[in-house]
Design a protein with these regions (language model features):
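Conserved nucleotide-ligand handling architecture
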Residues: 1-23, 51
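A residue-level signal for beta-strand positions that form part of recognition/binding surfaces
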Residues: 8-11, 27, 57, 92
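Surface-exposed, charge/polar-rich loops and edge strands
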Residues: 9, 22, 90, 99-100, ...
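Short acidic/glycine-rich loops and adjacent helix/strand connectors
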Residues: 18, 35, 43, 128
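Short, glycine/acidic-enriched capping/hinge loops at junctions between secondary-structure elements
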Residues: 23-28, 70-72
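Contiguous C-terminal substrate-recognition/catalytic subdomains in enzyme active sites
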Residues: 26-36, 40
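Phosphate-centric recognition/catalysis
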Residues: 38, 42-119
Length: 138
């Protein structure tokens, strides 16, 4: 696990290894539908939350698109998107990557994270996110 701090923001890049358990057979899979039970994935996500003062983690169901979800205070179930933007400093934003790239966006008030694959890149997910920030004076 790698943790980076920039100003008031903290970023973490998690691998499969569980930072709370040195047992090499304990993986920290946070993705549903990738081999672990839903119970195990939820437990792993709770462990990650625990590492960051039990803040709520906002995930979206990634669909390799250019869709971006704006999180304010409520999250409808099963949001399909590849980006999350918020100004709520009391939550964590989470995305999952393998061969796609994570892109982190920081403004004065808003912050976001994108899951960028070739489809999203081709369909301007980064440009859409940057325009969101610009329209809000970020």
């Amino acid at each position: 696990m790698k943790i980076i701090q920039y100003k008031n923001y903290v970023f973490s890049f998690l691998g499969k290894q569980n930072p709370l358990n040195n047992n090499s057979s304990q993986f920290l899979n946070c993705a549903f539908g990738k081999g672990d039970s839903n119970f195990r994935v939820r437990s792993n996500r709770k462990l990650v939350s625990k590492l960051f003062n039990n803040k709520k983690i906002i995930f979206v169901n990634q669909i390799h698109s250019s869709r971006i979800f704006f999180y304010d205070k409520t999250r409808p179930y099963d949001i399909k998107a590849d980006g999350i933007i918020t100004k709520n400093k009391n939550v964590l934003l989470g995305i999952l990557t393998a061969d796609c790239a994570p892109v982190i966006l920081l403004g004065k008030e808003y912050f976001g994270i994108l899951h960028v694959g070739w489809r999203g890149l081709l369909n301007n997910i980064i440009l859409n996110a940057v325009n969101f920030f610009i329209k809000r004076g970020e």
